[in-house]
Amino acid sequence: MSRGDSMLRFEIKDRDAAGRIGKLEVNGKKIETPAIMPVVNPKQLIVEPKELKRMGFDIIITNSYIIYKDKKLREKALEKGIHRLLDYDGIIEVDSGSFQLMRYGKVEVTNREIVEFQHKIGVDIGTFLDIPTPPDAPREKAEQDLKITLERAKEAESIKQIPMNATVQGSTYLDLRKLAARKLSEMNFEIHPIGAVVPLLESYRFKDVVDIVIASKMGLRPDRPVHLFGAGHPMVFALAVAMGVDLFDSASYALYAKDDRYLTPQGTKRLEELEYFSCSCPVCSKYTPQELREMPKEEREKLLALHNLWVIREEINRVKQAIKEGELWRLVDERARAHPKLYAAYKRLLEYYHYLEEYEPITKKSAFFKISEESLKWPIARRAKERAEKVKAKFPESIPHPIFGEIPKYLSLTYPFAQSESEEDFQIEKPTRENAILYIMAIAEYQFGEGAGEAFRDAEVEIAKTGMPRQVKKNGKRLATVRAEDGLLTLGIEGAKRLHELLPYPVMRVVVNKEAEPFARKGKDVFAKFVEFADPKIRPYDEVLIVNENDELLATGQALLSGREMVLFSSGRAVKTRRGVEEKK
């Protein structure tokens, strides 16, 4: 897979689990992901699009087929453009009629016609007319539908003039989902929705949704945003984002309001059952449930829709804050307990360790909290135990840990072992001047792999007044620093040189092209578009060696992407460079 020319820019700004906070830019308009698109029906505007914009929704989705089918709407859209038609200056994405195709079995438009129509009315993100196969359909039907979808994808690719969705289909057949994802990833599209999951969500088959999303994600390029079509209930946001979903859409805010239903992050309640509002949004702060019940239907519907939107927006922000703090798994764990089927889906997700581990940061801002038995299966915990076992082979002296069992004594300062909380306390063993170097060597083995400890065998370790190791030097030159926050090593350029000599290519390498080489030497950050190759075992926030195509060391820094992501992303930073070989002190 190579970097393709894209009409849309997407880069990762922050991350946790397989979730990411991203910046998506199209037609000069920017949004931050994860983001939710309220569904706007141009025939039934419960909440005006400009009001949605004021509430902070900078992207909406509407249905181009509904506009196309209505003669008056079609003529207005062609004359004014969709932004003036809806009186909305944010990003407008459109569906193509696929949902109607799934619900009613047919649509009166061709794939080419709807793609060309979307361009003519000036949408920001279009969608070609894929075939959504419902769950549990006969395999023969799923295969035939997917064949047509892929044919239409090729047609759309050849004529599209706007950024476009390419929806992953395949019913509940995971191999077909993965196949569709791989085929669509090879084409020039910008966003990949995962389609035909609404029936599963409506019937609380969340475990099947997890299987479908992961199968799709495993086949998709990581540099393209993923949209979970029809997922608009806040109870699933944390779980979906942890899987790697970036975009959601919600018609539920309006549909539930029509039925006097009230959204919460834990589920849906009927207005007639409520005595109190636990929410503090503008609607719930002003009215009581009784007052809403006594209102005329139309007024009540609008206010309930507004409440539902505030709850949706609040939960998206809560998910993003959890990512910033390295707490997304804790939020997923909490939300999963709202419903047994959601809890089962959470447990299923944790079975996909090898997928999740690639994107799991190597260190986090927050301590590891053992809040449940499931937390021991979080990727950060499983990886730590696996790495500790390898270190134990070389440093067999061990101590008991209340969460992780027997761990190497010399890793007792290191994340997540020292930075963890459970029912029982863990007492770290501070180094002595005699054994401090063993701590450094063990940390290097844990962090950089087998044999890395030898790079520091002859080093001197400075112990701070707190009794903790800090600077690692040789003949006055800094090799590394033990970070106070997580007990891991930040490399100095001399330490990077030693590791570079010791570790075989391509271990911990990020290879940059000739254009970026002089900037890396001077300590400038490395952007993804200049990365030629990266060790696929690099994980987010690893300390890495930046080299040129001849494997000459240029700099050292902290990876912001996984190794595979660095090679595929064309926007954003790949490595935060700490020190270049030619950088002046």
Curated annotation (Swiss-Prot):
Keywords: Glycosyltransferase, Metal-binding, Transferase, tRNA processing, Zinc. The active site is at D95 (nucleophile). Coiled coil: none annotated. GO terms for molecular function: pentosyltransferase activity; RNA binding; zinc ion binding. Disulfide bonds: none annotated. One of its GO terms (cellular component) is cytoplasm. Its EC number is 2.4.2.48. GO terms for biological process: tRNA wobble guanine modification. Its cofactor is Zn(2+). The keyword Cell inner membrane does not apply. Belongs to the archaeosine tRNA-ribosyltransferase family. This is tRNA-guanine(15) transglycosylase. It comes from Pyrococcus furiosus (strain ATCC 43587 / DSM 3638 / JCM 8422 / Vc1). The lineage of its organism: Archaea, Methanobacteriati, Methanobacteriota, Thermococci, Thermococcales. The gene is tgtA.
